[in-house]
Amino acid sequence: MPELPEVETSRRGISPYLVGHTILYAEVRNARLRWPVSAEILSLSDEPVLSVRRRAKYLLIELTHGWIIVHLGMSGSLRILPEYSEPEKHDHVDLVMDSGKVLRYTDPRRFGAWLWTDSLETSSVLAHLGPEPLEAEFFADYLYQASRGKKTAIKQWIMDNKVVVGVGNIYASESLFAAGIHPDRAAGSLNENDADVLVRVIKQVLQLSIEQGGTTLRDFLQSDGKPGYFAQELRVYGRNGEPCRTCGTPIETAKHGQRSTFFCRRCQV
């Protein structure tokens, strides 16, 4: 599933081909995604693109009269292609640009979304989101105070978008390993030093993944069709039974909220 680094990688990849250009029209071959493609997108015509932003795992394409909100779901990806590129089976949405390029949305599992909003402030999918992990609003004392009294396992807790956005399964496992924190620990057990270290490594892990173009495990590709390379940097995720790269202890796995968690029993306490 594309997480924050993959979405940010997509944003950076598509922005130069959209901003300052005009969407001539949208071609929707299959509107039945997680939610039906919004009618306003189906009727787009000669709409200049003003900006491409990201909030959590949502891409926000700013137009003159509103915003397209794109969520990549479980298996979605965006690519920039020549306008007349032949679509394949899972290519569901195209934004045809005045430059002769097309932004193509591919989603084999169709769990993604293409939505419309007149204003970001009134969008229900953006309401109640927590702070951005790479911004100054996500800091040690915030995390420490928010964790007081929480009995939920720390792994599951930091994946809650109301706590902090965009820390999905891969990066939660990797960040907890880097911080030396066992994923089963109650969130409320964090002390101030734990919170300081965890905030710092979350920022580092996410930033490194963005620099590497994200993590390609199955479906994610960058906007130029290339894979992300952060998978080569993974210390615990997907390495069940393999030796820890720090101490040699076999990596273990457990379930948190129906998600697989990977950790080292010796390095994480």
Swiss-Prot record:
> Main role?
Involved in base excision repair of DNA damaged by oxidation or by mutagenic agents. Acts as a DNA glycosylase that recognizes and removes damaged bases. Has a preference for oxidized purines, such as 7,8-dihydro-8-oxoguanine (8-oxoG). Has AP (apurinic/apyrimidinic) lyase activity and introduces nicks in the DNA strand. Cleaves the DNA backbone by beta-delta elimination to generate a single-strand break at the site of the removed base with both 3'- and 5'-phosphates.
Answer yes or no on keyword DNA damage. yes
Signal peptide from the UniProt entry: none
Subunit field text: Monomer.
Q: Which gene encodes it?
A: mutM
Under the heading CDD domains, the entry gives: EcFpg-like_N
Report the EC number(s), separated by commas if there are several.
3.2.2.23, 4.2.99.18
Record's cofactor remark: Binds 1 zinc ion per subunit.
Task: List the GO molecular function terms.
Answer: 8-oxo-7,8-dihydroguanine DNA N-glycosylase activity; class I DNA-(apurinic or apyrimidinic site) endonuclease activity; damaged DNA binding; zinc ion binding
**Is DNA-binding a UniProt keyword of this protein?**
yes
Q: Where does DNA bind?
A: H90, R109, K150
Q: Which PANTHER family match?
A: FORMAMIDOPYRIMIDINE-DNA GLYCOSYLASE (PTHR22993:SF9)
What organism does the record attribute this protein to? Answer: Pectobacterium atrosepticum (strain SCRI 1043 / ATCC BAA-672) (Erwinia carotovora subsp. atroseptica)
Record-level GO BP terms:
base-excision repair
Checking SUPFAM superfamilies in the record gives: Glucocorticoid receptor-like (DNA-binding domain), N-terminal domain of MutM-like DNA repair proteins, S13-like H2TH domain
Catalytic activity from the UniProt record: Hydrolysis of DNA containing ring-opened 7-methylguanine residues, releasing 2,6-diamino-4-hydroxy-5-(N-methyl)formamidopyrimidine; 2'-deoxyribonucleotide-(2'-deoxyribose 5'-phosphate)-2'-deoxyribonucleotide-DNA = a 3'-end 2'-deoxyribonucleotide-(2,3-dehydro-2,3-deoxyribose 5'-phosphate)-DNA + a 5'-end 5'-phospho-2'-deoxyribonucleoside-DNA + H(+)
In the UniProt entry, which residues are flagged as the active site? P2, E3, K57, R259
Q: Where are the zinc fingers (FPG-type)?
A: 235-269
User: What keywords tag this UniProt record?
Assistant: DNA damage, DNA repair, DNA-binding, Glycosidase, Hydrolase, Lyase, Metal-binding, Multifunctional enzyme, Zinc, Zinc-finger
What's a Pfam family this protein contains?
A: H2TH
User: Which family does the entry's similarity section mention?
Assistant: Belongs to the FPG family.
**Stated name of the protein:** Formamidopyrimidine-DNA glycosylase
